Amino acid sequence: MRLRVATYNIHKCRGLDRRVRPQRIIEVLREINADIIALQEVLSIAGQSREKDQAQFIAEEIGMTHIVGGTRMLKGGVYGNVVLSRFPLLDTHNYDITVLGREQRGCLRADVEIAPDRALHIFNVHLGTAYLERRHQGRKLIDEAILSNRDLKGARIMLGDFNEWTRGLATRLLASHLVSADVRVHLPRAKTYPGVLPFLHLDHIYFEDSLDLEGMVLHRSRVALIASDHLPLVADFRVK
């Protein structure tokens, strides 16, 4: 079977024009038409307006199941990572990878049932902005409790905003355990941040070799160039 996944830091739906417009993010996601989507920097305040209850509004509008992994508690809700899926969710877990004294960070795992008795494990990550912080977080991600968890029998995909624009320790550690869908190899225009004139490659996708990468797209539609300060990164896989 073929599977399309995407990672997208939506910057709380705040575009480069500084306007909060969830509808623009929805338009971008419809253009991408992915089966599984990892979002970062999402507000989820239940019962509030679409500008504040972004996770629920986006999921309902595009008709996908969703799960929220909060990294920061807010009054009446959370801020953090979200996984959207066309497939049923079997289980989820939110890992705290915060480094003391730094901004709260997390890794949201979603176990997705892509076929009867067949799961795919999605890890949605948003790492810190400091080098030493990311080094600690990279080591934590490959710990047995997260990426190396032997209780997880399906293929793994780890994707998100890694805040590393060069081959730092975190990305090298992950590349030693997973295959890197390196946009510098697959795409001529590889930068994902900031949106209109991107010059940094912050967003990455890693996967197990039981999956075949068939193609990658850095989605650069007119609305995507303004909807967030990141561009969405999309990968097409064939599941063996």
Feature annotation, model-predicted:
Residues 57:
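Extended active-site neighborhood of metal-dependent phosphoesterases/phosphodiesterases
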